[in-house]
Amino acid sequence: MLLHETESEYDSKSKKNNYSYYESSDFKPLIEKYNRIKYSVTEYIYLLTVKNVVLFPDVVIPITAVKQKSINLFKSAYYTYKKIGILTKKYFNTTFSIAKLNIQTFNIYSFNKFNKINKFNKINKFNKINKFNKINKFNKINKFNKTNNIYYIGTVAKILKLLIMPDGNTTVILQGISRFKIIKLIQVYPYFKAEIIYLKDEKPQKKDKEYLILIDSIKEIAIKIIQDNYKIPSESSFAISNIESKSFLINFVAYNLNIEIKNKQILLEYDFLKQRAIETFRFLNIEYEKIKLKNDIQYRVRYDIDQQQKEYFLNQQIKALQEELGDFSYEKEVEVLRIKSYKKNWSKEAQNQFDRELSKLKRTNPQMPEYTILRNYLDLMLDLPWKKYSQDNYDLYRAQKILDKDHFGIDKVKERIIEYLSVLKLKGDLRSPILCFYGPPGVGKTSLGRSIASALNRKYVRISLGGLNDEAEIRGHRKTYIGAMPGRVLQSIKKAGTSNPVFVLDEIDKMGLGSQGNPSSAMLEVLDPEQNKEFYDNFLEMGYDLSKVIFIATANSLYTINIALLDRMEIIDMNGYTVEEKIEISKKHLIPKQLKENGLKSKDIILGVKQIEKIIESYTRESGVRSLEKNISKIVRYAAKNIAMNKKYLKRINMSKIEEVLGPPNDPEKYELIQVPGVVTGLAWTIVGGEIIYIESTLLKGRGNLSITGNVGEVMKESATIAFKYIKAHNYEFGIDEKMFELYNIHIHAPEGGIHKDGPSAGITMLTSIISSFLKKKIRPYLAMTGEITLRGKVLPVGGIKEKILAAKRANIKEIILSKANKKDIDDIKKVYLKGLKFHFVSKMNEVIDLSIIK
């Protein structure tokens, strides 16, 4: 075969024909149909892998070869009229690189003169690759079949023209003929040769209207892209318009799409022309939208620049006219600001600062951004209530009445507030600690701040700190930033209009640490009485006196509050309400409030005590009253709807009507009488109040290992480990055979795995559960416990006792085991809340086991 001619044979033929640079006859026709293609039989052809291009049937492309091996392949195929299989590489670092593609796009019908082909020259020579020279016959062919570096579907092409350049490189003009797929590689040296099968393009029926419309749409949008993209020669639109072959139009447009190579390969691999046309049209639409967006952005940018220039020239003209007329409107504004400053009762330092900034404003062009910032700064200084205070009302009896009217229960909290106001009345300053109301949601922490403001006859302001993670929100931004503004503290003082409001810092436990600083640290200056007399705001750039402000903070959790910040506050616990308290709150506050908000009168709907209790027990699960208020609101809206529609309705709400309006009741939180060894009832605290929790344990054959499940935290895992180690160390005291630890594993589980559980208060509960499992003895019914344990077997006190007791009452618990150190917490609780409960105060685990396990 001529493909195996040597290089010398090529050179002899070159000399015989007397050529070194081909300028011979015209090209062969660019689109030439091959009727001799047989799709049912295989054929053997040589392969050429290229990168960054996918060749489609009928499309013409140029390729420049720099390797002698590639040049020989091109010459051999050209003189024997043999076809070449063009395959695309997936990765640029593949070892099968044979030729380098020239990116220049060729015209469909004609080629430029060859004196411009120098663009393809000057390609750096590649390092010689000896991998393929050392391949012995076909022993490495399987590597080609297994590689993922090339696509196995490509296009068979013929060489239309071969051009030898003066520098020795060779450029060929290829035209795609038909798609093919590799069946098997049969030769590696000197060129890749494979057995292939042709892939036929399945054309739709001639009367397929959808296909015809699709072709017209492709042509139309392709022309639009050419017209809107200044980088594409306008003559290309005429070429697109004159294409008659539908398949050639699809392939030509697909080849020229500005998309990734893998997407072009997907288009090539479609067997159905209609599907290829659909996907090509989709990519065309994406490209068209990108071009439109790009052009639109460029237009807007040019328009904005023109507008700015126009406004600048107009402003200069206006300024010149004003100078001629002697009328400067902004100078009048400056004078108005100066007159206002004379009326302010501020310090000499503040007056000097104002005068300096006012002088800057006078020298600044009103069209400059700095003018707006300076104006905002001066407005802030004038709007702040410098040394302006509201007159306090220290009538403590009046304050007590307001607190009792607005809040039912929480007597200890109200007593502490009265003490706070008493000190304020006698001493005249606020050097006492900042009050922080701590408790579950819905117990009235925020509303207490409003009541204090009302009692003292002071202004009330509130800022929510939840999610705040930027220090500038507290201290403000520096004036050098565009859009700078003061911090939320000074903004609230400005809004209050006095320098001594009651300032509620809501959700102080939910401040976060962000990349812009730590707002908790900035809050230290706000709350520290030694520092807030000269509170420095970055925007104000001078100190402002906050010492007369009554700051009140609220929090649901103390664990997330900065320790230094926590040290500056006095924590006042606001525990949850009992059922009786919730009923009274509903009658005195929630129901009248909802009737007023929904435009009803007290006679329009009647809710009895039993009905309110039903709502509390079956439709709420909280320490506060927020969810209770929502359910009462639903019932009030039921009445409002019927009144508005002139329908008859039941004014006195009964139990069945509650279920009709609120839906099926929730399962009440009641104690489950589970007489099974290893199951113990504990008491837990959550941010919404107290709950009962079951601890389960069981023995499994094993080697004495401990495991715990139920979405528990590290502290709870440590408590389980301490309990297990204590039992192993004191097994004879509890009557447990030592061999049991060698034969069995113990598994502890805390039900409701979707809820995270942590803390030390389940220590005695887990220890009791493990001993119950080893002894196979049941726990006394209606008994619950809470407490921390140590390795010495001591029972330590825990927190949240009131919430836990309320949860025990709701669950119908009769007896509770607590640490002796928690007895003081029981003494602080009203006797009415303890009715029906029996308490056992213990100091050691032996006492817990004696009280809990049935003998």
From Swiss-Prot:
The active site is at S761, K804. SMART domains: AAA, LON. GO terms for molecular function: ATP binding; ATP hydrolysis activity; ATP-dependent peptidase activity; sequence-specific DNA binding; serine-type endopeptidase activity. GO terms for cellular component: cytoplasm. Induction: By heat shock. Residues 674-855 form the Lon proteolytic domain. InterPro entries: AAA+_ATPase (IPR003593), ATPase_AAA_core (IPR003959), Lon_bac (IPR027543), Lon_bac/euk-typ (IPR004815), Lon_lid (IPR054594), Lon_proteolytic (IPR008269), Lon_Prtase (IPR027065), Lon_prtase_N (IPR003111). ATP binds at G439, P440, P441, G442, V443, G444, K445, T446. It is found in: Cytoplasm. PROSITE patterns: LON_N, LON_PROTEOLYTIC, LON_SER. Its EC number is 3.4.21.53. GO terms for biological process: cellular response to heat; protein quality control for misfolded or incompletely synthesized proteins. Belongs to the peptidase S16 family. ATP-dependent serine protease that mediates the selective degradation of mutant and abnormal proteins as well as certain short-lived regulatory proteins. Required for cellular homeostasis and for survival from DNA damage and developmental changes induced by stress. Degrades polypeptides processively to yield small peptide fragments that are 5 to 10 amino acids long. Binds to DNA in a double-stranded, site-specific manner. This is Lon protease. It comes from Karelsulcia muelleri (strain GWSS) (Sulcia muelleri). The lineage of its organism: Bacteria, Pseudomonadati, Bacteroidota, Flavobacteriia, Flavobacteriales. The gene is lon.
